[in-house]
Amino acid sequence: MEGRRFAAVLILTICMLAPGTGTLLPKDRPSLCDLPADSGSGTKAEKRIYYNSARKQCLRFDYTGQGGNENNFRRTYDCQRTCLYT
């Protein structure tokens, strides 16, 4: 019985400490994640990723290559790491 308890505590500890396993609470999420998608004021057409706080998802948008705001990621992974996971 003691071995099972130790194993359970060990597994829980690993899960809590492993990066990318927990969802951030809204108060812990960086404020940039609450900004709307902003395509900017340039003339290019680049696919970028932004965090949609209402849908709690990282979504694609067209970025013009100039201006905009900080809620602008090149990769979905970066958006998720910043706005979804610890």
Swiss-Prot record:
Transmembrane spans: none
Pfam families, A to Z: Kunitz_BPTI
PTM entry text: Contains 2 disulfide bonds instead of 3, as for all Kunitz domain proteins. A double Cys-mutant carrying an additional Cys bridge does not show difference in activity with the natural peptide. However, there are some differences in the kinetics of binding of both peptides to the channel.
Gene Ontology CC terms, in alphabetical order: extracellular space
Residue(s) carrying Threonine amide: T86
Tissue specificity of this protein: Expressed by the venom duct.
Cysteine-cysteine disulfides: C33-C83, C58-C79
Keyword flag Signal: yes
Role of this protein: Blocks specifically voltage-activated potassium channels (Kv) of the Shaker family (IC(50)=1.33 nM).
Family: Belongs to the venom Kunitz-type family.
Record protein name field: Kunitz-type conkunitzin-S1
Source species of the chain: Conus striatus (Striated cone)
Classification of source organism: Eukaryota, Metazoa, Spiralia, Lophotrochozoa, Mollusca
